[in-house]
């Protein structure tokens, strides 16, 4: 019922926008009983497509495409499946991996953006990248049973990738290899903290990260086209941050180093960042707007594991 209401609301809104364009300057007062009933099936295909693209993936697959033949035909068009957001799909009861594979098949090789926040297996990632050579934006979370090898094998097949968002636990990624495999990379988000801990770190006590500039140096050496960088909960120091600023000359739009408590953003480094970066998020800035969440226990385990591996 909620899905039908959402669909009807979008349809009515789109139709109203179109009718407003055709109205003359004369004011017309029509009684509700006299208004023409809209035949949604007869809407122009481009208008129907515009409406459908505003729906969630599950709304399209479970409802919209079943309404009529015309809509089913539009829903099968590869252009409907260029940009896919699957972040909120876990609230539904279905075979998530099968649905992802079906969406990739519907795109017919034209998938450009996909965002999957939870539970991607090595085999699913491989299925996506093997059939989406033009992919420009990938957002995934890395939990078991994903493996380092599976993640690296997948990402290294995406030479046109411009945006990479990764949420990982104890997996150590070879960022230098990723940078060389994805030379067009402009946005990197590598986050090591979930919002539950970020909002209230006092729940588990402060667990300092070991100083480690490996990620920072790898980024500096292999990602010269970066414009947006987010490293949350990373162990980099001032040395690593300076290396990034040196190696990424186009990094001017956005730099987010919240929860990177080994950075002391003062003096010349602070001046350098303030002068160059349009949007700077500091280590102690609020994370209230952080949209992703993993459990506190997972983050604590990640921090402990990182100390011994």
Curated annotation (Swiss-Prot):
Please state what the protein is called. Answer: Putative F-box protein At4g05475
Residues passing through the membrane, by range: none
Q: Which Pfam families match?
A: F-box-like
Classify the source by domain of life.
Eukaryota
PANTHER family tied to this protein: F-BOX DOMAIN CONTAINING PROTEIN, EXPRESSED, F-BOX_LRR-REPEAT PROTEIN 21-RELATED
Lineage summary: Eukaryota, Viridiplantae, Streptophyta, Embryophyta, Tracheophyta
Supply the CDD domains for this chain. Answer: F-box_AtSKIP19-like
**Every F-box domain range:** 37-84
- Annotated spans, Disordered: 1-26
